[in-house]
Amino acid sequence: MNDNILNSVNELFSEKRNIILIPHSSPDADALGSCLAIYHFFNQENEVNIISPNEYTEILNFLPGSENILNYERDKEKCEKIFNKGDIIFTLDFNSLGRARNLSSLISKSSATTIMIDHHENPDNYADITISDSKMSSTCEMVYDFICSIDKSKIDNKIATCIYTGIVADTGSFRFPSTTSKTLKVGSELINHGVNVTEIFEKLHNNFQFKRLKLLGSAINNFKKIEGLPVVYTSITDKDQKVNDFKKGDSEGFVN
């Protein structure tokens, strides 16, 4: 984050604010981890709300503060009232308003200052402040830098747990090429804040309910190979979803 952006951010938060945090539709661990980390960072001195465009996988309910996430599809009236009061909107882990689905029009019509933090390539020019770096492993790693640039001393176990979870999820437990020496250093610093590495791994990867295992079985059973290419693809049919009581996020991590 360059000095001009840092100065703009510090000026914005020089007084109490009404902050809205928005992840992308069907948010994953990186999106929700980013939202919750910023929620905990600003919540003591500001009014802060997280509004998800829709439902997210219940696997992520272990994240500290997840009980405070509002679902726009379930509670439109309450969410729209919050939008009317908001003066700062963070959009996290997406670079195009279309990824916010049913919230995109509310964001574009709002008079609030919009801050994008995202690690995907080619961001749209919708935000007042754009913090974008496609070389970063995850949005959570960027959020860590964002928080450190304002007040690193405020990072506690809750913030560290949320950020670490997002980084681990988006890097495949530090296996993917996006993992850098800096990513590992950030992970180390988060562990120093008491992050329970084993518990997070278990929650993310060994938390399969019976119906989700059956859904995975259906996905494997539907494998198709493209002849002449080292490519295999699959599909999950409407019937598979109905039989296995499918909910958004149940297929998270099946394909990478």
Where are these regions (language model features)?
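Solvent-exposed alpha-helices and their adjacent loops that cap or buttress functional pockets
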Residues: 13, 81-84, 106-109, 123-124, ...
